[in-house]
Amino acid sequence: MKKQNPIALLPIAVFLVLYLGLGILFEYVMKIPMGFYNVPIIIAFLVAILVACLQNRSVKFDQKLEIMAQGLADKNIITMLLIFLTAGAFVGVVGRSSAESVAYFMLSLIPARFAVMVLFVVACFVSIAMGTSVGTITLIVPIAAAVSDASGFGLPLCIGSVMGGAMFGDNLSFISDTTIAACNGQGCQMKDKFRENFFIALPAAVMTLVVIAILSFRTDIAGTVSQEYHLLQIVPYIFVLFGGIAGINVFVVLIIGIISGTVIMLATGNTAPYDLLTNMGSGASGMFETCMVAVLVAAMCALIREYGGFDALLSGIYRTFRGKRGGLLGMGLLVGLIDIATANNTVAIVMANPIAKEMAQKYDITPRKTASILDTFSCIFQGMIPYGAQMLVAISAVHELGHDVSAFNILPYLLYPMFLLVSSLVAVLVVEKDV
């Protein structure tokens, strides 16, 4: 083990102060809408890397560049970047109308009494298929508002149900950036992480549906929601979902999804060939910031590791958390605290990955379990913070439709993250020997 050096963790502190401090300033002092997401996260990481480069004068600048380059020369990082871009292209191909078709198709099958339960299930399915909780919320929350207006269900309950379903899907999706980051960071297969997560997420989802059902039967129903949909547009999502569950290589699954989506969108006349290429490019470019964050975090962490910062952090963790259960709780708390600070679960996972990997080796925890814990706990915290992208996007969407609702109205109805926390803690406490 290298010499422990807590000062080497200064770049992380600088990043958190910049990102969290400016976010609070913009959001709560200057009252800028979605202030946290107006903070340029890439600039914050560049400043943090500059601080890291100014540390440890005994190492020449050229050597520091070489250390950062070695940190990037990792198969998992390259794989992560390529999957990000390919997943973005897939989402660009299938577009908004396909996700809406999924929602309206399922709403058409179920009586109005169960509309909120359907919203939760629809959000689960769409988020698994799209791989983005924010994208799912953007698409489904306006439908949730329509359900609330037509049926008499409370708007906070409808929004909370959609947000819960979106986080369920984001946690399990094979093309979610959090799944990609966790699996590639820990070196495990996505199907193995899916199986680990599924048995934690399913009980939480079932309990959420039970509570939603109880609340639904206490509500007087006034009407229902109906809208045209194109069933054929659901097919690419089905290919991606079942291909991932079957354990087919993620690149093959995404290419099948892109090809099937291209054929269907062109055959139905929903998209012109030129627009299709533009949409693919837009989808891929939408992942550029996430890719750059992964690159910058890898470079920064390489310097921190070289200086002995991670050894100091790990030493403190080892003194506090003992045994496999302690190690799993330590990982969950670590990624959760980073998520609270950054309000971005992908960034939290990317930053926690190298530390969690060393913890896993120390406590003899399998890569699939480590990836599952990182993804699940980041999902829990991200799904409950009132300044997260999911909450802000949901509120913005309903405000545009003329509804007045605050984060604190919605928080009591974020049932899924609450039950997921309970389910995760139970999973940690009854952990088996071969995790």
Set out the residue ranges of the language-model regions:
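Alpha-helical transmembrane segments of multi-pass membrane proteins
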Residues: I83, R113-V126, G152-G169, G326-D339, ...
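Hydrophobic alpha-helical transmembrane segments of multi-pass integral membrane proteins
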Residues: M80-V91, P111-I143, Y318-E358, K362-Y363, ...
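Juxtamembrane and boundary regions of transmembrane helices in multi-pass small-molecule transporters
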Residues: K2-K3, G164-M167, N171-Q227, L232, ...
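Interfacial loop-to-helix junctions that mark the boundaries of transmembrane helices
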Residues: K2-Q4, E27-I42, Q70-K75, M106-P111, ...
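Core transmembrane alpha-helical segments of multi-pass membrane transporters/permeases
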Residues: N38-L46, L50-Q55, K64-S98, R113, ...
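Juxtamembrane helix-boundary/capping and inter-helix hinge elements in multi-pass membrane proteins
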Residues: R57-K60, A73-K75, G152-P156, A181-F194, ...
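Membrane-interfacial loop-to-helix junctions in multi-pass transporters
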Residues: D74-M80, Y104-V122, S148-C158, Q227-V235, ...
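Hydrophobic mid-bilayer segments of alpha-helices in multi-pass membrane transport proteins
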Residues: I7-L20, G35-R57, I78-T86, M117, ...
